[in-house]
Amino acid sequence: MKKRNRAAMLVLAVSMVTTPIALLHPLSSYAYDGKSSLEPIQLPADIVHLLTELKEDYVPLMKDLHVDSYGGTSKSGYVINLSDRKSVITTNTTLNISTNAEGDMTQFVLHDVNRDKTTKINKKEAYQKAVDFIRNYIAVDHVISPQATLSLDRASELDHLAVVSVYPQLNNTWVDKETARVMVDSKGQVVGFQQDKVKLPTPAEVADPSKAVPLEKAMKEWQDKVSMELVYDESAGKLVYLPEQLPTIDALSGEEVQSVYKTTSETMKIKGTADMGVWRDTKKMEQMLEKDFGLKLNQRTYKNVKEDKKYKNSDIDRHEWNASSYQSAWITLDRKSKAPIEFKLDGPVEKELEKPLTHDEAKDIAVQFVEKYLLSKEQSFSVKETSLVENLPGWADQNLVRPISSFAFHPEIDGIPTKRPLFYMEVDAKKGNVVLVQVNDLPSMPATITKDGIVKDEKAKDAYVKEANLRLAYWYPKVGTHSAKLPQLAYLPTADAKSLQIDAATGAVEETWLEWKASH
């Protein structure tokens, strides 16, 4: 938030009407909570300026909003809540803004149930809008991602949004740890902003960037290790080559950093017997949770957010069974079709397994879930499996690392997998069961795919490595959500390098959307 004079106060009138009114530029301000009389809302002048700026430059939808409530001080920071609410129960759009004691905006969340999720996002324009927002409202020294990524997170209602991330610097070197992000919708409107305080080590605690090996040496090692995979790009309807593995290079030694994960791929024909009606019936979902996951539902509080007015016109339903001490369950469904979007168990179990599952046992459990609850026909998949290596590095706290095996089920056509998986699953070896399921909405696939006339993978790799670049960074090694306390100096592929793919028919290098995922 730009620094302004906070001494001036502007009193905005409060009206107990049930339709929006234009009292003072830029926004009408009234509170509706069912009471017969309310005191005037007083907003500091800099908050009024902030709201004016946002409406004029970034959020045109604010012209239809009014201030519902406001609190805080210049010493503690402010919280401002706006909406288009015309009565206690009718709300389509809400906007929540928070600032800190320094006067900087820390959070901005626009929730519009009628947001357009079909119009194609203009990647360049969305990026420029986000960059302009960042330069106006983030005062600290930072590095802006060179391109926007695409959020597809339906479970959090963050799908179909362009995301531009912000990173800190240390020793004039990029730190690969997101400190802020801006989200832009298909209309070029800013709908989300989050800024977090990231504690960085002192310059003396990390490696000196001047000690890094030359970029050319790192590039040679990296290029030798890169491999390409032929996949079917379901959104473009064609075959492409993607970088299958993007290694990290230790900047002090010039050698590849060994991964903490083992990855394999297996073709599997799965005979699904799922009765998809389970997702349409709350009682059947509860039977599943009790029988297959051992949840004691009489010890949990059920909530259907469909009944929450915030989600009144949403395109999702979320069923929650919340527990204060042990695992909570959340099931997110498409509101119209009742198809599952996400299944999640979070929190400790009452008793973990004395002997953790092996990776093969975890795979069996994942496949059984697909057969029983997600797939109602026979289908071939390329299953990409990830598990932890046996001997984790010293920075990994064994008490904090969860033994997670993940499985991405990519539909396979004539031996070629799709670019995105249909199902993604995680199994916790100590809990002994599935803890996360995500279902993607993929377009219809062709019955057959021919590889006739496509370029060879060697040619595709040559084309890719000629365009891909590395950058020096402080990189935090991670295992799941657990990361090292101190970053490692490393050469990482740039965002541009990660977004490249090769058209298998022509050998041309193409830029595509990278998918954004929350880091925690």
Language model features with spans:
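Long, terminal "pre-/pro-" and other extracytoplasmic accessory regions
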Residues: 2-520
